[in-house]
Amino acid sequence: MRDIKTYLSVAPVLSTLWFGALAGLLIEINRFFPDALTFPFF
């Protein structure tokens, strides 16, 4: 039971960090390449 409580307390923290990093990455891509439907570096 203690392992389940540890998992339930770790998963929201990791998902918050992951989605925060992903949102920051998307914001930075949109800052350097605004409105890019096709990325110019491909």
Curated annotation (Swiss-Prot):
<keyword id="KW-0812">Transmembrane</keyword>
<comment type="function">
    <text>May help in the organization of the PsaE and PsaF subunits.</text>
</comment>
<dbReference type="GO" id="GO:0015979">
    <property type="term" value="P:photosynthesis"/>
</dbReference>
<keyword id="KW-0150">Chloroplast</keyword>
<feature type="transmembrane region" description="Helical">
    <location>
        <begin position="7"/>
        <end position="27"/>
    </location>
</feature>
<keyword id="KW-0793">Thylakoid</keyword>
<keyword id="KW-0934">Plastid</keyword>
<dbReference type="Pfam" id="PF01701">
    <property type="entry name" value="PSI_PsaJ"/>
</dbReference>
<keyword id="KW-0602">Photosynthesis</keyword>
<dbReference type="GO" id="GO:0009535">
    <property type="term" value="C:chloroplast thylakoid membrane"/>
</dbReference>
<comment type="similarity">
    <text>Belongs to the PsaJ family.</text>
</comment>
<protein>
    <recommendedName>
        <fullName>Photosystem I reaction center subunit IX</fullName>
    </recommendedName>
</protein>
<keyword id="KW-1133">Transmembrane helix</keyword>
<dbReference type="GO" id="GO:0009522">
    <property type="term" value="C:photosystem I"/>
</dbReference>
<dbReference type="InterPro" id="IPR002615">
    <property type="entry name" value="PSI_PsaJ"/>
</dbReference>
<dbReference type="InterPro" id="IPR036062">
    <property type="entry name" value="PSI_PsaJ_sf"/>
</dbReference>
<keyword id="KW-0472">Membrane</keyword>
<keyword id="KW-0603">Photosystem I</keyword>
